């Protein structure tokens, strides 16, 4: 595994690490070894705004799965996310983020409320607890008004890019 990616992990903010950990934890629930299967990995990365192709995903897994377990622990996952962030260059464009915001904002009122967030996260097909959803809402809702406006959404997405 490239040391450059390991070094880049050290540059992640605590907030970025916490957001990655929250997404990782959603998928690791019930796993006895604290790792997620490579199958689940694509879902986690998509949830965090990354969209690797199956080939890119396999290539990343081959690089970070140092112990050959076929699963990815959190440290390996962080290295993967950093690599994906670097490969993604500047991340999502403003237009892509605007489209994503509109997908979440089902009633088109300019805000993402808890119910809209829950609907979108449950659409991933994974079992997500109310606590997980509320934690994500809390992370995104900087002014604590119970909903995420577009500026808060952009700020939140910067953290996951």
From Swiss-Prot:
Keyword terms of this UniProt record: Acetylation, Calcium, Metal-binding, Muscle protein, Repeat
Domain annotation EF-hand: ranges: 16-51, 52-87, 92-127, 128-161
InterPro entries linked to this entry: CALM/Myosin/TropC-like (IPR050230), EF-hand-dom_pair (IPR011992), EF_Hand_1_Ca_BS (IPR018247), EF_hand_dom (IPR002048)
Any GO BP: cardiac muscle contraction
GO molecular function: calcium ion binding; calcium-dependent protein binding; troponin I binding
N-acetylmethionine modifications at: 1
Gene3D superfamilies assigned: EF-hand
Alphabetized SUPFAM superfamilies for the sequence: EF-hand
Residues binding Ca(2+) 3: 141, 143, 145, 147, 152
Amino-acid positions noted as binding Ca(2+) 1 in the UniProt annotation, renumbered to this chain: 65, 67, 69, 71, 76
Binding site for Ca(2+) 2: 105, 107, 109, 111, 116
One term under GO cellular component: cardiac Troponin complex
Protein family per UniProt: Belongs to the troponin C family.
Note: Slow skeletal muscle Tn-C can bind 3 calcium ions per molecule. Domain I does not bind calcium.
Function: Troponin is the central regulatory protein of striated muscle contraction. Tn consists of three components: Tn-I which is the inhibitor of actomyosin ATPase, Tn-T which contains the binding site for tropomyosin and Tn-C. The binding of calcium to Tn-C abolishes the inhibitory action of Tn on actin filaments.
PANTHER family: MYOSIN LIGHT CHAIN 1, 3, TROPONIN C1, SLOW SKELETAL AND CARDIAC TYPE
Name of the protein in question: Troponin C, slow skeletal and cardiac muscles
Organism: Gallus gallus (Chicken)
Lineage, uppermost ranks: Eukaryota, Metazoa, Chordata, Craniata, Vertebrata
Originating gene: TNNC1
């Amino acid at each position: 595994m490239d040391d450059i990616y390991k070094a880049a992990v050290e540059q992640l903010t605590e907030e970025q690490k916490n957001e990655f950990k929250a997404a990782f934890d959603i998928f690791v629930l019930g796993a006895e070894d604290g790792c997620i299967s490579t199958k689940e990995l694509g879902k986690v990365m998509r949830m965090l705004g990354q969209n690797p192709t199956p080939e890119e995903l396999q290539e990343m897994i081959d690089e970070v799965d140092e112990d050959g377990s076929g699963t990815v622990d959190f440290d390996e996952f962080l290295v993967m996310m950093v690599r994906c962030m670097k490969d993604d260059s500047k991340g999502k464009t403003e237009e892509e983020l605007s489209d994503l915001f509109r997908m979440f904002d089902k009633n088109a009122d300019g805000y993402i409320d808890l119910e809209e967030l829950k609907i979108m996260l449950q659409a991933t097909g994974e079992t997500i607890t109310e606590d997980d959803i509320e934690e994500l809402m809390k992370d995104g809702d900087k002014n604590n008004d119970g909903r995420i406006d577009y500026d808060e959404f952009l700020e939140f997405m910067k953290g996951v890019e």
